[in-house]
Amino acid sequence: MPLTVIWVFFDLGSTLIDETAADTRRIKEMISGTDVTEEAYREKRLEMIRKGRNGDLSEMEYFSLTKTPWHSEDEIPYPDAVPTLIELKRRGYKLGVIANQNYGTERRLKNWNLHQFFDIIAASAELGVAKPDPAIFEWALKQADCCPQNAVMVGDRMDNDMAPANRLGIHSIRLKRGLGAYHEPQSDDEIPEHTISKLSELLDLL
């Protein structure tokens, strides 16, 4: 990784934040009162992800399920999130968030004791633009007064994180965890510059 990296931007879900409990709760609520089992839903979701289709909406359509609310209060930071962020700040990196999130991202970051680490928060609901639209990345770069080549994007999604970063010239690092671990590149744009399996490995790249 070039020594000119100044800014490190992070996705939230399945990158810094563990959404497992919230995901499980939504599935249970959606299938309640139907003959769809949680196992069947999860198997179909993985099947569609492996085929290159994003999860949730495809499975909901397949099983004719109604989307239920997402419970952000069930989300928690991964154990490796805070130690990694602390070390990056110690090394002098500027940190930011670029994430597709419901309203209230700053409040949730404060509840998770993560807000203190970030200089810029680009959240889709507040900005009115969502990944993979390059505009949300361009907004973050403008706020940071940073050239793309001096920035890194860390995320789990090939389509929402890696592809737009690559197209803009931002260094891309894929974190293989959560459902994103099952994604396969659908185009050359989605191939990350680096791939890591745990967040602490980021420290060896920077």
Question: What is the meaning of each model-derived region?
Answer:
Residues 2-91, 106-107:
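N-terminal helical cap/lid subdomain that shapes the substrate entry/recognition surface
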